[in-house]
Amino acid sequence: MISKQGWINLYKPKNITSFKAINSIKKNFQITKIGHAGTLDPMAEGVLPIAIGKATKLIPYISIMKKEYEFTITWGSQTTTDDSQGKILFESNYFPTKNEIEKKIINYLGYINQIPPKVSAVKINGKRAYKLFRENETYTIEPKKVFIENLSITKHSTDKTSFKIICGKGFYVRSFARDFAIDLKTYGHISSLK
């Protein structure tokens, strides 16, 4: 039996939304008051902190804590979703070297301005960006100030680089991949996120 108060650290698998993961718990355990601290992209896997009952009051405090991700950028193409689930928008046959990537990392530490992905949960005039995208609406997402505490390469091959990052609230790894690739004079998208 599950308590009707407290926290569940749910390991969300790939290819389901955070919303679907929460609804499954809500339905299967007849929980009325439930919420989550942050959202994981559908293609991402990892821990999704879920608050139940009175614990939902703590969500704003948990949400501001630092997050750690491991992710891989595939170089050479930018997609509509900034991950491997989207359609290819742009392509390049230029792949950055490990040395070029390492030199750019320093520019991204600390506070940076970041434009969230076109397909995201960001609200624009009360409507989620992903809904506007599906309806083929034209819209602009304003940049947000985000924080990167640490960023390091964990693995590199010709067309892919894996990283580990510690970042603050509101950071989009997909946006980072898109912008970082453009800064390296190529295109890129997230092919794995954990």
Regions found by a protein language model. Name each.
Residues 1-194:
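Catalytic/RNA-binding core of pseudouridine synthases
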